[in-house]
Amino acid sequence: MTQKTFVSGDVLTASDVNTYLSHEGGAWTSWSPTWTNLSVGNGTVSALYYRAGRLIVWKLKLTFGSTTSVSGAIRFSLPVAASTGIEFDNTFGTFVDATGSRHFSIAQSISTTVLQANMVNSVGGYVVQVVTSSTEPFTWTTSDQIFYSGAYESLA
């Protein structure tokens, strides 16, 4: 969706309203996240977002293939840079093991363009974030999945 700046004297049309004020915000756009400590290999990624003004709504799904691998804390890039000072600790996801077990996850903001996928665990009666690795929250293998979705204010 192309951004439009309205100036004095412009006429707001039905098309403008549908494009800029609707919760639909236009068509979903795909993006290719940049991964850190994760090699997609022959896995499949579906990463989509839409923009409504400065609001970015996004969703991400990664299904592991036989050559997908994890070597440390999983990080991925956002589709559009976030406004400075925004924390993403309210972005939730799920890690799904090929056996069917599901693990709740929270994405931690590393920068305005990168999130880190952390698992959630209970330690001493408290819920804490735990960094992912090749064996956390489980040993990653073919058909495992990572799901995330979120919304945030873009930088521009």
Where are these predicted regions, by residue range?
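Surface-exposed molecular-recognition determinants
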Residues: 3-4, 8-14, 18-156
